[in-house]
């Protein structure tokens, strides 16, 4: 059985919304792959992330904002014959999003983006942010340039 392409936007959205953490791959300043887990928000096809004011990923994104974001869900181990190793497989659904990360610097926009992230985890989108907190947090958005989805066993 081959993986099938996930083409329907609704199924792609379902995979993205079903995971708590995504993994963002980038190329570091020495040309090496670098992957980090992130909390995220997703609304109207746009991804949102946040981080501290300094760090390796911030330095990377200033030089090369191109990323690949991975989401995977619905894992289920299965087999046809319990004692035959090659009959075992893993059901899954996955989505990859490619694009360029852009920093959000407008304070009102940062609050909106942070509330999109908070809504994913809390169900609420009406949080307050102190001025020092909203000034110090780095907020990023990614408008997808390319989206790929695959499912195996579903």
Regions found by a protein language model. Name each.
Residues 1-18:
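Extreme N-terminal tail/first-helix region
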Residues 57-80, 86-88:
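Helix-adjacent hinge/juxtasegments
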Residues 17, 62-67, 119-123:
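Short, intrinsically disordered, mixed-charge
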Residues 21, 35-37, 66, 92, ...:
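Broad gene-expression machinery/nucleic-acid interaction feature
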Residues 45-46, 65, 145-147:
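Beta-strand-connecting loop/turn residues
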């Amino acid at each position: 059985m081959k993986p099938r392409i996930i083409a329907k936007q609704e199924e792609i959205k379902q995979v993205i919304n079903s995971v708590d953490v995504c993994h963002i791959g980038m190329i570091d300043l020495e040309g090496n792959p670098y992957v980090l887990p992130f909390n995220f928000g997703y609304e109207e096809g746009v991804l949102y992330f946040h981080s501290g004011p300094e760090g390796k990923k911030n330095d990377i994104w200033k030089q090369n904002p191109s990323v690949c974001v991975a989401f995977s869900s619905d894992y289920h181990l299965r087999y046809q014959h319990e004692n035959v190793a090659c009959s075992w497989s893993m059901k899954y659904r996955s989505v990859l999003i490619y694009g360029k990360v852009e920093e959000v610097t407008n304070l009102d926009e940062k609050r909106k983006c942070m509330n999109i992230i908070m809504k994913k985890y809390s169900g609420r989108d009406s949080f307050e942010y102190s001025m020092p907190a909203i000034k110090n947090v780095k907020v990023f958005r990614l408008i997808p340039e390319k989206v790929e989805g695959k499912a195996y066993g579903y």
